[in-house]
Amino acid sequence: MDRLRIPKHRAEVELTGPDGEARRFSLFLSEHTSHGGPERVVDLLNGPREFLPAVDCETDATTFLARSCIVIARVAGPLWDVDEVNLPLEHEVEVVLSNGKALSGLISYVLPHESCRVVDYLNDPAPFLALVEGERVALVNKRYVLRVTLR
C-alpha cells in the first residue's frame, strides 16, 4: 500500500479565519507538481480542493480545513524563485478586509506584458492574492477583500 502513496512534505502556516483568530497548522504538500518543483502553499490554496488536510501545531490533531473560510495564510517567503527572464512587477499596497482590518505590503507578480496591470493581477481567477510582508508572505482570500489601495 505504501507504494501507492504520494510523497508529501509538511509546511507550517499561520491561518486566520473569519473570526480573526490565528492558528498554526502544518499542511501536506506534494513533492512534485506540474510547474516542475515541489508544491507550495499558494499552489494548494489556489487549487481545486475545498477541504485541506492539516495538523494543528498546538494540539497535534488532524483536521480538515475549509479553504473558502481561510482569510489569510502566512508563510515564510519568497513565493517563487526570481530569475532574470521573469522579473516580477511590484506595487506597494494597502489591502482592507471586509472586517476592517488593514494589511500593508507589496503585491509581486509576473504576467504577460499585455495584461500586467494591478487590476489584471487582482482579477486573476486564483482565489488568493499574495502580499509580501517583509520576510513573510500573506496569502489573502479575495472573498474577504474590501479594497486594495496603491500607496
What residues fall within each predicted segment?
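Conserved RNA-binding domains used in RNP assembly and mRNA/RNA metabolism
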Residues: 1-151
